Amino acid sequence: MVPYFEMAAASNFSFLCGASHPQELVERAHALDLSGIGIADRNTLAGVVRAHAQWKDIRKESGFRLFIGCRLSFIDGTPDMVVYPRDRAAYGQLCRLLTEGKHRAAIKGECHLEWADLLFRARQFQIAVFPPDEDEPDFAARLTEIAQAAPGSVWLALTMPHQGQDGRRAERIARFAAQAGVPLIATNDVLYHHPDRRPLQDVLTATRHHTTVFAAGRLLEKNAERHLKPPHEMVRLFRDYPEAIAATADFVAPITFQLDELKYAYPDEPIPPGKTAQQHLYDLVWEGAARHYGADMIPPKVQGLINKELALIARLEYEPYFLTVYDIVTHAREKGILCQGRGSAANSVVCFCLGITGVNPTQVDLLFERFISAERKEPPDIDVDFEHERREEVMQYVYDRYSRDRAAIVATVISYRSRSAIRDVGKALGLSEDVTAALANTVWGLSGGGIDRQHIRQAGLDPDNPIIQRAVELAITLIGFPRHLSQHVGGFVLTRDRLDETVPIGPAAMDKRSFIEWDKDDIDEVGLMKVDVLSLGMLTCIRKAFDLIHQHKPQLYGGEKLTLASLPRKDKAVYDMLCKGDSLGVFQVESRAQMNMLPRLRPQEFYDLVIEVAIVRPGPIQGDMVHPYLRRRSGQEPCTLPSPSPQHGPANELQQILGKTKGVPLFQEQAMRIAMEAAKFTPEEANQLRRAMATFRKMGTIHTMEKKMIDGMVNRGYDRTFAENCFNQIKGFGEYGFPESHAASFAHLVYISAWLKCHHPEVFAAALLNSQPMGFYAPAQIVRDAREHGVTVLPVDVNFSQWDNILEETPDVHLALRLGFRQIDGFSKRDTELLIADRQEPYRTIEDMHRRLRLDRRAFTLLADADAFGSLDIDRRAALWAVRRLPNDETLLLFRAAAASELAQEPRTKLPEMAASEHVIADYETTRLSLKGHPLQYLREGLAAEGVSTCRAVQEGADGRRMKVAGVVTVRQRPGSAKGVVFLTIEDETGIANIVIWPKIMKVFRREVMSARLIHIEGRIQRSLEGVVHLVAAKLQDRSAALIEMSGREAQRLIAPSQMAHHPRNVRVMPNSRDFH
């Protein structure tokens, strides 16, 4: 068979152009018996690692080759060309070339290249030039110039596009080649692996050009021929040019480069003179141990672990990595920025002694090998959380410390999800915006999987319409396609040498940031280390709470400011509060599911919080581990350990793994260790399982390990049900699960935030509000909860408020919470500073304020709309009227005082009082909360006449009782582990109620569940032994329109369309729900 290499294959990382994944191209090329394939995406290397990972499995079985290249497009008229680096040095130059083009482009994501950029590098590449589709007078001269710049390295690409004039076109291209003295090379200029993808490629093209498939005309491919073709077909097509087929082998002959050649070198850290990195790390660790335990009181167990960890770190030469993270954390603490490591790093006593993590792994009995293992041969991965408001300071420190050409953020691939896929496909197929929106709103979830005909019909559309059917089919295929690259939340890659010779770097949309083209899975594949500089809103909240306590209660805690390490431990009152499910705002345990779990688990110590954090996750739930654990914890069933047959091992071989969780695996590490102990996985197989688990949601690869693990356990005598549950748990962790070390780090913050809520509720509420946006709840819910805990909350006021929410001493209570100007939507911090700066004397009237301040009319209107003039004895309506009478912003300064004086003498108009409901609506619209009431209380009379109960009545209702309730939807949840069950949380003036909707009810009332803001529910009370209450829905009704009756304002200001829903923190009168899938 004649060898043929396809050297111009574009994947879907040629964004909105290629219509196949890199993996699909590699797999299909091998299946068609091609000798090799070159992945060459347009001005990017973003997809090459995925192609490389797919190829690694194939190459073990054959001589099939993969080539890493790029299709270069120029802005100066230079023809497109695919270039392939011959060796590692050439690859580095290709990366730098693309980096230069990305930084030159003014728009993020673009790459502006000119011929001069390639000219001095051209000799290092194999180059195939693509002729223009139509005659260009200067092409022959440009081709000659390119050939002279890289003699012997340039080919002219020849395609057979099946467009009726292939023969004449080929003759023209052959003449160009002869004139320039370059050979022809055959290619199909591939855009997809199979012709079935042509319709999707049409959609991508239309989307790229912001048009429809029907209007795109010549922008679309003329046929479906640009797919991978077998060698015999390419030989037939190029029968008149056999030398072009043979040239593909000549083209690839000098290319030796593979991504395997990338060798990572971690940057050397500055160390004190006379020391090595190993010695410096050794000294820092033992100094930290002395601080934690006392110089002469370090427990022998800790000493042994430190020595063991330091020895392995030295063996693997990871000292610079630990010194880097230590340096970043130390810098943050010197700046007063709270931080804490999490994830697998919490397994390390070295990280604990360096102050990187806050959990003592010896007290929780965590496993260091989960963090670093010589067998895995993978770099460690330390995640550190910083205050979300100050994380950028830390990131810029990293850039300054390592320079822009040696440090960059990892990429995140923004991929199509179900709704975005349907929207783009719908637009491309010419569907109207309302039809596309209706179709998108029938989808629940992030990864799709089809749309039920009934759901399409419920959206008012015809499921038999061929365009609707086509849109759904294409959208399903499009799900998971990359749309563009963005920056990771904080993962940095740092290198000793130039990073832009390993991977291209481009500017991020955010100022002073840059990121590479590979995501976290890609860098794992090629062995690059990263440091995660992450943000966590709760750390911001805790730091602000510590500041408030020190400011207002300096006599407490010995006058010292609290820290993450100094806060009192083992406080019974904190655990008693959590056992009641009283956890609104508390880190990680504030969701409805966690609130329900707390009374059932009844945490009494720190490790219980570790379990609490981890147990409400798909892993334990899908593995059917939650209920057995709770029954054993409560003494309802004995704590037995699964065991193998006597001939295969001791009965207690899982004791060390499952002993502390009562014989039930709850953590990711336990499932992994069971695979090794019970199924006898080798370390390599266990590592494959771990990697499959990490990429399950994206790649769906974990099922390949299922039979091996289950059969391995059953063959050794374990119960099949237990084995299947263990693997289901692993699949659940692939969806979303916590390793024990991660749960332990988060449990530390659970306790601290719960302690603040328990002992300083006014401080905690103020800190939560001042740290927005963060967390699960909207300001209205935070304030309601604070008032239920005895906190006095005072409104925003021009004479008393600051930008932040503050604590204010009042005659009747020690400390009240005063709402700040930050609660007023649209009111700027600059206007706040002006207002406060001139407040040495109280403001007496609005005219007085206007005379003293340089605030524009808009600022005064916002203050009036927020009812912030209470201390002036002016209500909202009077204030709005007074603001309208103020001089225009253009009034000359010379006349301001005179105008104000004249206006002040004008008699006041007697205005009708605003209804209380109008005040509440205006409060929600301006500050997202109201101290005057809840929208539902003004509908209560009518609801009560219909027999509708309050949420409080539902909470107090007897098990099995049928009730009606109505409330504003605050949360919608359809967990993947719940087998189609949907959960709603609704709220009225008395509190919240939890609603359960079974699949058969969801099927009937899907539209109401997905779009209602105010919902009426009939159902039956379900009360557990621990007092957890749900209303199991039987009938639902959308009552959103009822809110219009509360105000004369325009309806669109009250009822936002469901497709405009955002985060629940941004709720107004009709709160936008938070939807989980």
Swiss-Prot record:
Record-level GO BP terms: DNA repair; DNA replication
InterPro entries: DNA_pol3_alpha_NTPase_dom (IPR011708), DNA_pol3_finger (IPR040982), DnaE2 (IPR023073), DnaE2/DnaE/PolC (IPR004805), DNAPol_HHH (IPR029460), NA-bd_OB-fold (IPR012340), NA-bd_OB_tRNA (IPR004365), PHP_dom (IPR004013)
Catalysis: reaction(s): DNA(n) + a 2'-deoxyribonucleoside 5'-triphosphate = DNA(n+1) + diphosphate
Gene from which the chain derives: dnaE2
Protein name per Swiss-Prot or TrEMBL: Error-prone DNA polymerase
GO molecular function: 3'-5' exonuclease activity; DNA-directed DNA polymerase activity; nucleic acid binding
Pfam short name (any one): DNA_pol3_alpha
HAMAP family registered for this protein in UniProt: DNApol_error_prone
Predominant subcellular localization, coarse grouping: cytoplasm
Organism from which the protein derives: Brucella melitensis biotype 1 (strain ATCC 23456 / CCUG 17765 / NCTC 10094 / 16M)
Subcellular location: Cytoplasm
